[in-house]
Amino acid sequence: LVQVLYQKKETEWLGVFHASAVGKNGKCMLFLGDSGNGKSTSLALLQAHGFECIADDFVPVDAHSQEVYKFPAAISIKRNSIPVLLPYYPILEISEEFHLKQLDKHVRYLPPVNELSPNKMPCDGFVFIKYDAKAPFSCTQISSVRAFEKIVPDSWLSPIAANAATFLNWFSKQRCYELIYNDNSEMISEVHKLYSDEL
């Protein structure tokens, strides 16, 4: 689908990441996390506070420019996140719920707000995010080696040698963070700092 959308061959993509691409002020960062870690919920919260959803779950990156491309898919919201998001998205109360049998999940879909964002933008870093009600808040920078170990299992990376070399060079220059939170307001405030280069 992404190849048809942007008229690009598979060889022209650096990779596709299982992440949320979040944009603000011309910057884009990729938020990654295991299922149940709050990745899509945090994306919806950030969208409600001035950030843009560039893509959710399926994030394509161009091999030539290493830019993140917009992907027009809705944000999947799990049942247990509905109460948290209803104050910002009342439409979720009446949205149809779907049962994803293979994953044993019940989800509703939230349209992304990204009409004003460009179709592509440079990546400014990776954030490995996790909601943990029992853990203290922390946001720490991690090495690109540790980050690489985290992204590979859930990503498609081009097997072409030139693209692989480009990816390694590009990824080694990215800022990578691990963000653990138990308070939504604190998480949003910290992400604002990331986009303002205050960390």
Residue ranges and their predicted role:
Residues 42-43:
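Post-Walker A alpha-helix
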Residues 20-34, 48-199:
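Glycine-rich, often acidic-flanked micro-motifs
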